[in-house]
Every structure is written in C-alpha cells, then in structure tokens.
Amino acid sequence: MNSTCIEEQHDLDHYLFPIVYIFVIIVSIPANIGSLCVSFLQAKKESELGIYLFSLSLSDLLYALTLPLWIDYTWNKDNWTFSPALCKGSAFLMYMNFYSSTAFLTCIAVDRYLAVVYPLKFFFLRTRRFALMVSLSIWILETIFNAVMLWEDETVVEYCDAEKSNFTLCYDKYPLEKWQINLNLFRTCTGYAIPLVTILICNRKVYQAVRHNKATENKEKKRIIKLLVSITVTFVLCFTPFHVMLLIRCILEHAVNFEDHSNSGKRTYTMYRITVALTSLNCVADPILYCFVTETGRYDMWNILKFCTGRCNTSQRQRKRILSVSTKDTMELEVLE
C-alpha cells in the first residue's frame, strides 16, 4: 500500500521527537535500571508487588533503548535509514511497551485493591508465584498480539514534492492499512479501555477504604490518596490522548479514498503524532511513581545509585543496607491490615 506525503508532518517530527525522546532517554534509562534493582530485591523478599514492578520497569527500559533509532528516524524527517528488520523490531517493542505497561499498572492497582479492601481474603492472589504466572502470561499474550508487526512489511517508500526526494517510512504511515486499523481497535479496547476502567474502580474502592478507616493516621491517608491520584493522572495523561487520536484516525481512515485525502484527516494525523511522542513519557513516570513516591523506595533507590556510581560508603553496615529491602510495603498501603 502507498503512503501519502504530509510535508508539514515531517518538519514537526524533525523537532518534536528528538527533544522529547532525548529527555526520556536521559531520565528513564538510569531510573528504570535503578527500579529494576529495587523491584528485584523486593521480589526476593516474597513481594508480589516486586514482580509487577520489575516487569513494568523492564518493559520501559526495553522501549527506551530503541529511542535512539526513532530519534535518527525523525531527525531525518521520517526517513528510516536502518534495515527493515530493525524497523519491525523497534515498532514491536514500542507497542509492547504501551500495552504491557497498561497491563502491569492494572495488576498493581488490583493487587493494592485486594490488599486494602480485602486484607484477610484472597491470599493466593497476592503471592509471588501467582504474580509471576500473571506477568509471564502478559508477556506471552502481548508478544502474540504484536507479532503481526514482525511478519508484515513495516517500511514503505513515499515521494514528497516539496523535498523532491523519497522517504522510507517505518510503520506509522498515512493512511492506515486495514490490518492496522483492526489491530488498533482491538488494542484500544483491550489494552486501554478495560485497564482504565479497572484502575479507576480499584483506586476508588481503595480511596473509600482509606477514608473511612479510623486506624490510619491523617498523614498516612494523605500520602495514600496522593499516590492514588498520581497513578490515575499518570495513566490518563500518558495514554488517553494517544488512544483518543488513534480511535479517531481509525474511524476517519477506515474507508478513506487514497486519491482524495481530507484536510481533517491530515490534521488528525498531525495531532496523533504529537500524542505518540507524549506517550513515551510513561517511561519516566512509572519509576518515579512506584519507586520514588514512598520513603523506602527513595531510600533504596538512592543507595543503589550511590553504589553504582562508586560513591557509596565502604562501611560494611551500609553495604548490607544496599542489599536489603525494607519489609515495609513499597506502596505503603499495608497499614490497613
């Protein structure tokens, strides 16, 4: 299938994506490496939450490592200069990150809901073994759902009159192909709408339980409520604009006439590309939310960073502290037992 050239979009991508992606790389790669260390140690302490956090950080890190390729692509005004196989792999990891992230965020929300609302029930759902099984299932299912990108031809050549040259596009072409429309509609429903509703319901129930629990101090209540709001806002801001524009794109381009593209369709595509760039910020938000928002998370992360940079004190006591994890729940919601 051919692609229609949108000259203005190439110019926008040339400046927008490198700026956003460079920021994400600088912040998210060290943050997610630290988060992997912290969550791994938590998982060793029989924490099911550590399993979900580890998977979330791994997904973010894998995507962040592909961003240099996308920076080169957009800096060259949407011209893919690498092999088609790298295009397929980069697109695969990008969408794997989008929808594995929403899945793991949902798992964390459900886990916190069970811990707070039903602290004396459903113990088997809050074991490390169960969390490991769920995480592996998510990785396998997301691999299957996104595998279509590994065998479909993801590169297409378009000619732009303004540039008087050909451009090799990677995956995101205009208009969408039929298989892309069907896949995106499926993703929007199962990978965004269902997780969003689940997170909203779980967080609302947790908020109600915390608010009416007299055994919890006001300071602790405020911290928990702040965390719940942060989780919801981060999910909505990172993923809602993208999926709204993706849904509009699918509707407008479902029966588009290639020879007669409307201005509204092109404007929608421009807005969609902006939301793609903003979605990458979830790689920054995730480690901040789930490792820095609590006192124990910040302390363990800081010790690991000092250890990695060689500035850690050589005393045996501090070394032992680096390799230990507080038994206090990272999310600090277990106070309601």
UniProtKB/Swiss-Prot annotation:
Protein name according to UniProt: G-protein coupled receptor 65
Regulation of protein activity: Activated by a network of residues that connects an extracellular-facing cavity to Glu-142, a conserved charged residue buried in the transmembrane core of the receptor. Protonation likely drives conformational changes in extracellular loop 2 (ECL2), which stabilizes movement of transmembrane 3 (TM3) and a series of rearrangements that connect the extracellular-facing cavity to Glu-142, a residue only conserved in proton-sensing G-protein coupled receptors. Activated by BTB09089, a positive allosteric modulator.
Major subcellular location class: membrane
General function of this protein: Proton-sensing G-protein coupled receptor activated by extracellular pH, which is required to monitor pH changes and generate adaptive reactions. Activated by an optimal pH of 7.4. Ligand binding causes a conformation change that triggers signaling via guanine nucleotide-binding proteins (G proteins) and modulates the activity of downstream effectors, such as adenylate cyclase. GPR65 is mainly coupled to G(s) G proteins and mediates activation of adenylate cyclase activity. May also act as a receptor for the glycosphingolipid psychosine (PSY) and several related glycosphingolipids.
Phenotype when changing D172A: Decreased proton-induced G-protein coupled receptor signaling
Any one Gene Ontology BP term: apoptotic process
Alphabetical keyword list: Apoptosis, Cell membrane, Disulfide bond, Endosome, G-protein coupled receptor, Glycoprotein, Membrane, Receptor, Transducer, Transmembrane, Transmembrane helix
SUPFAM superfamilies tied to this protein: Family A G protein-coupled receptor-like
InterPro entries in the cross-refs: GPCR_Rhodpsn, GPCR_Rhodpsn_7TM, Psych_rcpt
Disulfide bonds: C5-C160, C87-C170
Membrane-crossing residue ranges in chain numbering: 6-42, 47-77, 83-118, 127-153, 175-212, 217-252, 265-293
Domain remarks: A multitude of proton-sensing residues, which include extracellular histidine (His-10, His-14 and His-243) residues or triad of buried acidic residues (Asp-60, Glu-142, Asp-286), contribute to activation of the G-protein coupled receptor activity and pH sensitivity.
Name of the gene this protein is made from: GPR65
Region listing for Extracellular loop 2 (ECL2), in residue ranges: 154-174
CDD domains the record matches: 7tmA_GPR65_TDAG8 (cd15365)
PROSITE patterns in the record: G_PROTEIN_RECEP_F1_1, G_PROTEIN_RECEP_F1_2
Membrane-topology annotation of the record: Multi-pass membrane protein
